[in-house]
Amino acid sequence: GNGSRSYSYLGSISENITRKQWNNYIRPIHGQNAWSFASLANGWIAGVSREVLQEAAFHGHICEGTLGGYSIVKALIKYYPPVQETLTGGGSPADVTSYKILGVPGGSDDDAVLFFLDATIGKTSYVGIDTTATGATENMLGFIRWDAKSLSGDLIIMSFDSKKIKADFKAETGINADAGSLEELKYCTWWIN
């Protein structure tokens, strides 16, 4: 058969392991899978929501973009919710508007928005636009809250400031989030909490 009783790694995976333990972990796992497993396990133990874990599995790992995209979607729904129809009889009102998403490809936040707003490519709600020449950053997303009946909508542009968030993390913890994988795990946990 294809199965094996031997394992590639047996031990702890979290932001709290030592650099030596980390090296023992990544040596047999290799590449992106090592970060994927570590970030998902660390996010789970940090108490990240089920929705973020599902999106991270879709995306491949938990990272600043995953958490930033989730934060953007939460803010979008809170401050610019879908407009709903008014019903005079019973039943649940339907959404009158839908979101059209204008992404700036390159950041993981795009995957998060695709997942959380169920806007996968086949649903034609997402368009990636190369806006590099305009000064838009990869952490920026545009949304059109579209009303198909009136053929009008509201343009909403949102982003997260990676430099500021990392500076806040460093000021609070003394840790440079970009110093290595263990530091990035600590940064993600800080963001989760």
Predicted features along the sequence, with ranges:
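Non-transmembrane, aqueous-exposed alpha-helical and coiled segments at domain scale
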Residues: 1-62, 71-193
